[in-house]
Curated annotation (Swiss-Prot):
This is RNA polymerase-associated protein RapA. Keywords: Activator, ATP-binding, DNA-binding, Helicase, Hydrolase, Nucleotide-binding, Transcription, Transcription regulation. It comes from the Bacteria. Interacts with the RNAP. Has a higher affinity for the core RNAP than for the holoenzyme. Its ATPase activity is stimulated by binding to RNAP. CDD domains: DEXDc_RapA, SF2_C_SNF. A motif (DEAH box) lies at residues 280-283. Its EC number is 3.6.4.-. One of its GO terms (biological process) is regulation of DNA-templated transcription. ATP binds at residues 177-184. The gene is rapA. It comes from Vibrio parahaemolyticus serotype O3:K6 (strain RIMD 2210633). InterPro entries: Helicase_ATP-bd (IPR014001), Helicase_C-like (IPR001650), Helicase_RapA (IPR023949), P-loop_NTPase (IPR027417), RapA_C (IPR022737), SNF2-like_sf (IPR038718), SNF2/RAD54-like_C (IPR049730), SNF2_N (IPR000330). Belongs to the SNF2/RAD54 helicase family. RapA subfamily.
């Protein structure tokens, strides 16, 4: 390297310093001053990591005074360059610019500039960049985008609802699946799709206070969506950053109570300009025509101002008709304006349901059914379809004709677009429940303490006394003090220890009402038998609960028993276990259902054993009988339980408080009778039509198959590992399909997106991720992959490379130039541009004559024949063929235009076809189904117009290039 004072060089390792000037030299070192960043660097002369900056004829260069020069001639004198040419601003000719006056800010951002400046990247980085571009393009175009990356089993009805609703513009929908069918996951999938497609940027979730953490965890664990819980404290903190605290976060989660109690916070939430509002447990919003509750008004206010609304609620039958109408009114007040009209309309659906039932049966259609269908579809000619169904055509043609009729009828079915509801009856795949009720002798110690408590507790209300009597161990402890070890003599504990030993290989979930009971049970198992157990209660942080859940889930060396308190277990699911022990019983059938629902969920592969040990002659024994004989609530899900409970709870409280069981048999008998009546009403009122629509039938199955085919994509694994390598993350193989990824000191950026400071355990396997909550499930949609790709693009990794091709058939020194262009439409994400024209890579492979060989030379196969070169040799090769490279880039720029035009044309065609089909369908439906909102139609019309403009203006630029030189050795 020969240096001279005043020469301009650029640092290879710190390109952001700008252009440096040689300001001092001695025999061993050279000093460069980087004026743009006000830094000096001293390098050893013989191997300084710097590259000489030289420009060629045709380049445009900037002067320190702010004007630019188009170079026409370059002279070198004593190691310094002088450039001659024309000023760009004044068009003055024969202007002289000495290199000392070059702008210090010059950065080599264009790939060709980096190549000429010797800033040559590693060959594998170039390959990684190209793969990132192509994979990202394919992901954006996929119709399953937003559904593949969630940590959840592939359950057809959930995926169907999410796919159906998630693609709509500002969906307004009621999700009313029965318990255990996964409404939260459906809502999460819809949110995830809306976020990825850019349709929703600001989201507000309103839930009952007890469910806040569950939602926070579910959104983070399953969908990598990080919500912030807002309460009064958080709002006061946020006030420092913004007038309206809700403006400080994009994804907000808060309780309904919080908005109800404070008018100020409610008004601030109203001004939050949300794109999507999600309300869980919406059946608790009470409404009547003359007097809506305050909670209802809060949600109504938010729903009026928010374009997209998801309401999650119990099934409509549990709600009753009026209450169900009130939910629909929140979604579309113009359409559901009058309760009487709604009732009348509902009654008209009976013939539609009958018609569909006869189509589904696959048998010959009776004339009556045909007349009904013809009448219902009066605006279309259905005769040809009837003919196909009755002809001797193949089964497939018949099935598709039936399906077409069904689809058309479904579309006309009033609430089909607004309401989705699945029942266990309509969905297969639930386990059987085996119930074991075990009466046990009551220890003497309890009898004494309960008798004494009965004498002193005269002033308590019946309800308080009934609650207290449910937990004899707490009464005993009150008398004996906190050190009292009731678990040394409690017969339920003795039974539990035996049970756990008997089921050595099985995971057992124990649920108790109180956190204190759960903690003491763990102590009993540990101290009396050395059994590995872990606890889960509301006093623990989310992270601690996760660790406990992961310890329980571990196959080897994990806990055999997990003991949960009532609140601690809310919203957590342990499908991998099938043994449930209820150490005590909750007072309310909904809570009982929730306990069983921890194991009895869609996705449970085995039958469930439910063990209920209870002490004879206590309140627990009374409750156990009522749940079992009155409601059959242990053996079956009990959608009617709440209604029966509301009717008989006062009588039950009296019995539990006084211990007088003389009326118990009568209450059990009446409860069972009422329960039976309510259940048969439910069965008759089952809206089969709605069920057919909600579970998606064949379509749902196809979605599952499509996603299954992308699971376990080896392409993703290879890509992710090279991405982590390039960015500088440490990777340790953990076995069991798992890797541990941690930040290193040599990372390209100080913190990696989506990766916690302490690192993370990741897996690419869906089943592993489902059984291990502490692992991240990596898919193309995961922030670690998306963020990594964004990093590659923004940091300019792999934009220029040089490779050698060893091929004796070609003369030594032959060059090829691989050019990667990217077509990009500058448009806001919410416009939906990425569906039709995401960033699209176009690859050209130029030979030395300027022909494009990309059609004959496939990327991956060709890449395997190339070998990398070091930066020094690469720089020399570039310098020797720089003029040829210039010429080939110019030829490439001309050739690529034709391909860009084809890309634009294809995007326009896809967009017009997709959106016009949807538009025509909605317009046709509008005539017969008032559930189509005008806004939906207007939104699509506006979107078509907007996208046409964006696609026409899409630009192309050179993203990266690779020079390939033929050698023989």
């Amino acid at each position: 390297m020969t240096f001279a004072l005043g020469q301009r060089w650029i640092s290879d390792t710190e390109s952001d310093l700008g252009l440096g000037t040689v300001v001092a030299m001695d025999a061993r070192t050279v000093t460069l001053m980087f004026a743009a960043s006000e830094e000096n660097r001293v390098y050893a002369r013989n191997d300084a990591p710097v590259t000489r900056v030289t420009f060629n004829v045709g380049d445009v260069i900037d002067c320190q005074e702010g004007w630019s020069l188009k170079v026409e001639e370059v002279l070198e004198d004593e190691g310094l360059y002088t450039y001659f040419g024309t000023r760009e601003d004044t068009q003055e000719t024969a202007v002289v610019l000495r290199e000392i006056f070059l702008s210090n800010q010059i950065r080599f951002n264009k790939p060709q500039d980096k190549l000429y400046a010797g800033q040559i990247d590693r060959m594998d980085n170039f390959v990684l960049r190209y793969r990132a571009l192509t994979n990202q393009f394919e992901q954006h175009k996929s119709p399953m985008r937003g559904l593949c990356g969630m940590r959840a089993g592939l359950i057809p009805h959930q995926l169907y609802i999410a796919h159906e609703v998630g693609r709509r513009h500002a969906p307004r929908v009621l999700l009313a699946d029965e318990v255990g069918l996964g409404k939260t996951i459906e809502a999460g999938m819809i949110i995830h799709q809306q976020v990825l497609s850019g349709r929703a940027e600001r989201i507000l979730i309103v839930v009952p206070e007890t469910l806040q953490h569950q939602w926070l965890v579910e959104m983070m664990r399953r969908f990598n969506l990080h919500f912030s819980i807002f309460d009064e404290e958080r709002c006061i903190e946020a006030f420092a950053d913004a007038e309206n605290p809700f403006d400080t976060q994009q994804y907000v989660l808060c309780s309904l109570d919080f908005l109800r109690k404070s008018r100020k916070r409610f008004e601030q939430a109203l001004e939050g300009e949300w794109d999507l509002l999600v309300v869980d447990e919406a059946h608790h919003l009470e409404w009547s025509q003359d007097k809506p509750s305050r909670e209802y008004q809060v949600v109504e206010g938010l729903a009026e101002r928010t374009p997209g609304v998801l309401l999650l609620t119990a099934t409509p039958e549990q709600l009753g008709r009026e209450s169900h109408f009130a939910r629909l009114r929140l979604l579309d007040p113009d359409r559901f304006y009058d309760y009487e009209a709604f009732v009348e309309e509902e009654e008209q659906y009976a013939p539609v349901a009958d018609a569909i039932t006869s189509l589904f049966s696959g048998e010959k259609l009776p004339d009556e059914a045909k007349n009904q269908i013809t009448e219902l579809l009066s605006e279309q000619d259905v005769e040809p379809l009837f003919r196909i169904i009755e002809s001797n055509s193949d089964e497939e043609a018949k099935a598709s004709a039936r399906q077409e009729l069904i689809d058309n009828l479904m579309d006309r079915h009033g609430t089909g677009r607004v309401l989705f509801r699945n029942t266990r009856a309509a969905i297969k795949g639930f386990p059987t429940r085996n119930v074991h009720l075990m009466p046990m002798d009551i220890p003497q110690q309890y009898t004494t303490s309960m008798r004494v408590a009965g004498m002193i507790g005269g002033k308590m209300s019946s309800e308080a006394r009934a609650m207290k009597n449910l937990y004899p161990e707490e009464i005993f402890q009150e008398f004996e003090g906190d050190d009292a070890s009731w678990w040394q003599f409690d017969s339920r504990v003795n039974w539990l220890l035996e049970k756990v030993k008997e089921k050595r290989g099985e995971k057992i979930l124990v649920i108790a009402s109180r956190a204190s009971t759960a903690l003491q049970l763990e102590q009993a198992l540990r101290e009396r038998e050395g059994i590995r157990a872990t606890v889960f209660h509301e006093g623990m942080s989310i992270l601690e609960r996760d660790k406990a859940a992961a310890y329980f889930a571990q196959e080897e060396g994990g806990a055999q028993v997990l003991i949960c308190s009532e609140i601690g277990s809310e919203g957590r699911n342990f499908q991998f276990a099938n043994q449930l022990v209820m150490f005590d019983l909750p007072f309310n059938p909904d809570l009982l259902e929730q306990r069983i629902g921890r194991l009895d969920r869609i996705g449970q592969n085995r039958d469930i054993d439910i063990h209920v040990p209870y002490l004879k002659g206590t309140s627990q024994a009374i409750l156990a009988r009522w749940f079992d004989e009155g409601l059959n609530a242990f053996a079956e899900t009990c959608p009617t339980g709440r209604a029966v409970y509301d009717k008989y709870s006062d009588a039950l409280i009296e019995i539990l408080a006084s211990g007088d069981t003389s009326t118990l048999d009568e209450i059990i008998e009446e409860s069972a009778k009422l329960n039976k009546e309510l259940k048969s009403q439910l069965e008759q009122g089952r809206d089969r039509l709605l069920e057919m629509h909600s579970n998606g039938g064949e379509k749902a199955q196809q979605i599952v198959e499509k996603i299954e085919s992308t699971d376990g994509d080896t392409n993703l694994v290879t890509f992710a590992l090279s991405l982590f390598d390039t960015i500088g993350l440490n990777q340790d193989d953990k076995g069991e399909n798992a890797l541990v990824v941690t930040p290193s000191e040599h990372m390209m950026v100080p913190s990696y997106p989506g990766l916690p400071y302490e690192g993370a355990t990741i897996t690419f396997d869906r089943d592993t991720a489902l059984s291990r909550e502490d692992m991240h499930f990596i898919s193309w949609e995961h922030p670690m992959i998306q963020g990594g790709i964004d990093l590659l693009m923004s940091e300019g990794v792999g934009t220029s490379a040089v490779s050698l091709l060893k091929n004796k058939a070609l003369p030594v020194g032959t060059i090829l130039l691989e050019l990667i262009y990217a077509v990009d439409a500058q448009a806001p994400k919410r416009s939906g541009i990425t569906r039709f024209l995401p960033k699209t890579p176009i690859r050209l492979m130029m030979d030395s004559r300027g022909n494009d060989l990309s059609a004959q030379v496939e990327f991956e196969g060709f890449n395997r024949q190339l070998s990398p070169v070091n930066r020094h040799l690469g720089s020399k090769l570039v310098t020797s063929v720089q003029k040829d490279v210039h010429r080939l880039i110019e030829a490439g720029d001309v050739l690529v235009e034709e391909k860009v035009e084809a890309v634009r044309k294809q995007a326009q065609q896809d967009m017009q076809q997709s959106l016009n089909t949807e538009l025509e369908r909605l317009q046709a439906l509008k005539a017969v189904n008032p559930n189509i909102r005008d806004e939906e139609i207007e939104a699509i019309e506006a979107q078509i117009k907007e996208l046409t403009g964006y696609i026409n203006q899409a630009q192309v630029q050179l993203d990266s290039l690779r020079l390939i030189v033929v050698s023989h050795n």
